[in-house]
């Protein structure tokens, strides 16, 4: 079964994220558990936790259908010791918040070398950061997102994801989230079913589907291989509809959150309905 949703706002309280997801007929959702552009946040109150869990129960969202995202400020591969420590502390806090909320996944961008250390050193720092966070938490899987490769961001090659996983001690609590826009911008073609087959055959060989814990379904304003991260609505960008239809009809993408981060929230309900219909199309055929 496919879990299909969007990254919804948690404004006014975390419970509202589940309510907003239900309003667009989503069977999955993503959210920030705190302000994504601030380092610190007030601890979660018992009331906030209880209200969130109650809303998820009311609208039938289990932890397998929810893909929280951490703060954009965190850089787990930071070249400077003090800044790395700050990022690690913030990441542990994000993991602990998920733990408190009964969530089992935390999606994050791996990190950037800022032109100050080698890719290999940065990837090793990211893996070490994950190990530290896993040691201090329970039950939450660290889900590494592939990137478009803007600036000095790592994670734009499947080999980067594999190298990070290789350095993580507890393989049962690490996974990846593949963002289609990021992959396309990083040079993984998705414009035809044949290209999708090739890209995900590479993914299976280099990383492995057992590590796929979520996806971000985004078309791309950015051009192929441009290393520029610019999302678009499904079918309106340079990837086109075929990739998303192909994903919907492949059972390797079952049982994980498939999350829209497309640019027009007003049509998320339509995009979700369209994605759901592609599954039915296969079933009828």
From Swiss-Prot:
UniProt cofactor note: Binds 3 Zn(2+) ions.
Keyword Ion transport applies: no
Residues at which Zn(2+) 2 binds: 145, 179, 216, 261
Top-level taxonomic group: Bacteria
Binding sites annotated in the UniProt record for Zn(2+) 3: 182, 229, 231
EC number: 3.1.21.2
Protein's GO biological process: base-excision repair
Gene giving rise to this polypeptide: nfo
Cofactor(s) of this protein: Zn(2+)
Assigned keywords, A-Z: DNA damage, DNA repair, Endonuclease, Hydrolase, Metal-binding, Nuclease, Zinc
Family: Belongs to the AP endonuclease 2 family.
Pfam families tied to this protein: AP_endonuc_2
InterPro entries: AP_endonuc_2, AP_endonuc_F2_Zn_BS, Xyl_isomerase-like_sf, Xyl_isomerase-like_TIM-brl
PANTHER family, A to Z: APURINIC-APYRIMIDINIC ENDONUCLEASE, ENDONUCLEASE IV ENDODEOXYRIBONUCLEASE IV
Purpose: Endonuclease IV plays a role in DNA repair. It cleaves phosphodiester bonds at apurinic or apyrimidinic (AP) sites, generating a 3'-hydroxyl group and a 5'-terminal sugar phosphate.
UniProt binding sites for Zn(2+) 1: 69, 109, 145
GO molecular function: deoxyribonuclease IV (phage-T4-induced) activity; DNA binding; DNA-(apurinic or apyrimidinic site) endonuclease activity; phosphoric diester hydrolase activity; zinc ion binding
Lineage, broadest ranks: Bacteria, Pseudomonadati, Pseudomonadota, Gammaproteobacteria, Enterobacterales
Catalytic activity as recorded in UniProt: Endonucleolytic cleavage to 5'-phosphooligonucleotide end-products
Protein name as catalogued: Probable endonuclease 4
